[in-house]
């Protein structure tokens, strides 16, 4: 038993040890015990609860508004020690599958992909739900509102999202202040913060390297890992920066900024990765990966959203797939896994690959690890499975690891990349 009950009616408490006055007087009613941890926190039960009740309610709302409200609820829940504890009890995995990467020890290989929390609004919430790392952004140098609304759509039968957000975010200056406030109030987050760097829409392509570099410089002290996003389909001509000249110029400039800041602040340089699109040939993918590695990138994120669409017999999904923008979710799974395997074959085992695209359960994550991913991320999976996805994936990976002949998750990486 956790041994405490807090009720608002008479401010009475039953607990072991001393609680601060503000907790005793709080207007909440929380009962935590072994029954909660042993029953309600089981990932399958919590996942079913979300699918039966949470997801149907969100279905009646505009996709972007539902996203914003869910993020606000997570932020609110993580702002109070009691509700933050409840998040940990309900959603945090109870197993450890450690992975060492970039000088950090990740509790397991599962993290949050960029796009879910663009402006770093719910960092403590993501940590409380058990993710091993969180990627904020895309962050652009300048604040921008993105494309006209509506711009986010759900295809429920295919478990896919289509968006044309257009790098809407608060901009690097405001996000720097938000991260600084977070550190001043709460200290550094207990898990690594990754920062996805995007190009400001008004910045010409031939000045993109300066735009990325300025955002990197502004957020350098607050992020642990940085991802250069040259693959969003929702910023005009952005994917042209994946060619040799554009990618090389951006990487060299950002690496130069990285080295200068590390020297100036007497610190270690920060890992810098690139994120690529799925809409290219195998030969193009291999060329981009080798170009990035040759020019000093510390790894690659595979992959961003796709402009391709699957066939469907469901009218609502067909309407969504008719929308312009990038698609994520289950239909991207096989393509993403194929790309991971392709890159792993091309670059060998010593270059980190972050796998993202269509992860909705432990089997999806396991397949990406086998294909060669060092870590994996999800975005759409959280929309359709809810916050219990982390526990589902991590516990499922643990079960598969025990049933395999591998001693650790690190031993799984790339075992089926041939």
For the regions a protein language model found, what residue spans apply to each?
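One-face residue pattern on beta-strands with alternating periodicity enriched for small/polar residues
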Residues: 1-3, 25-39
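Extracellular/periplasm-exposed beta-strand and loop segments of Gram-negative cell-envelope proteins
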Residues: 4-27
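Alpha/beta catalytic cores of nucleotide-metabolism and tRNA/nucleoside-modifying enzymes
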Residues: 41-90, 150-153, 157-173, 177, ...
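Glycine/Thr-rich beta-alpha phosphate-binding loop at enzyme active sites
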Residues: 84-93, 233-246, 291-349
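Long amphipathic N-terminal alpha/beta scaffold segment
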Residues: 85, 89-108
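Active-site entrance/lid segments in N-terminal catalytic domains of soluble metabolic enzymes
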Residues: 98, 102, 111-295, 309-312, ...
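Glycine-rich beta-strand-to-loop/alpha-helix junction loops that act as flexible
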Residues: 113-114, 275-277, 353-359, 379-380
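Glycine-rich phosphate-binding active-site loops on the catalytic face of alpha/beta enzymes
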Residues: 135-144, 230-232, 299-307, 365-392
């Amino acid at each position: 038993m956790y041994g405490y009950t807090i009720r608002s009616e008479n401010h009475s408490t039953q607990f072991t040890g001393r609680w601060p006055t503000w907790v005793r007087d709080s207007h909440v009613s929380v009962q935590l015990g072994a029954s909660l941890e042993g029953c309600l926190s089981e990932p399958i039960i919590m996942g079913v609860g979300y699918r039966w009740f949470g997801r149907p309610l969100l279905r009646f709302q505009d996709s972007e508004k539902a996203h914003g409200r869910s993020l606000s609820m997570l932020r609110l829940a993580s702002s109070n020690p009691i509700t933050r504890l409840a998040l940990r009890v309900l959603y945090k995995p109870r197993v450890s599958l450690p992975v060492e990467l970039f000088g950090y020890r990740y509790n397991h290989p599962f993290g949050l992909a960029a796009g879910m929390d663009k402006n770093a609004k719910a960092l403590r919430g993501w940590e409380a739900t058990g993710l091993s790392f969180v990627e904020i952004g895309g962050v652009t140098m300048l604040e921008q509102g993105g494309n006209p609304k509506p711009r986010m759509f759900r295809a429920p039968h295919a478990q896919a999202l289509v968006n044309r957000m257009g790098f809407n975010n608060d901009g690097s200056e405001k996000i720097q202040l938000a991260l600084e406030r977070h550190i001043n109030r709460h200290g550094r987050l207990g898990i690594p913060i990754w920062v996805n760097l995007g190009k400001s829409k008004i910045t010409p392509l031939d000045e993109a390297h300066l735009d990325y570099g300025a955002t990197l410089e502004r957020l350098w002290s607050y992020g642990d890992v940085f991802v250069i996003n040259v693959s969003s389909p929702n910023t005009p001509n952005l994917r042209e920066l994946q060619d040799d000249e554009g990618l090389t110029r951006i990487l060299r400039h950002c690496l130069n900024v990285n080295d200068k800041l590390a020297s100036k602040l007497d610190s270690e340089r920060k890992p810098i990765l690139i994120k690529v699109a799925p809409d290219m040939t195998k030969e193009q993918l291999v060329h981009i990966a080798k170009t990035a590695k040759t020019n000093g990138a510390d790894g690659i994120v595979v992959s961003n959203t796709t402009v391709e669409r699957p066939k469907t017999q469901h009218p609502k999904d067909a309407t969504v797939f008719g929308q312009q923008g990038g698609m994520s979710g289950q239909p991207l799974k096989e393509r993403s896994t194929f790309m991971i395997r392709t890159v792993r074959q091309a670059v060998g085992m010593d270059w980190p690959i972050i796998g993202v695209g269509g992860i909705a359960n432990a089997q999806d994550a396991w397949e990406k690890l086998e294909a060669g991913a060092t870590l994996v991320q999800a975005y759409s999976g959280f929309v359709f499975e809810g916050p219990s996805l982390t526990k589902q994936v991590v516990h499922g990976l643990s079960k598969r690891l025990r049933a395999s002949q591998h001693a650790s998750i690190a031993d799984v990486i790339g075992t089926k990349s041939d």
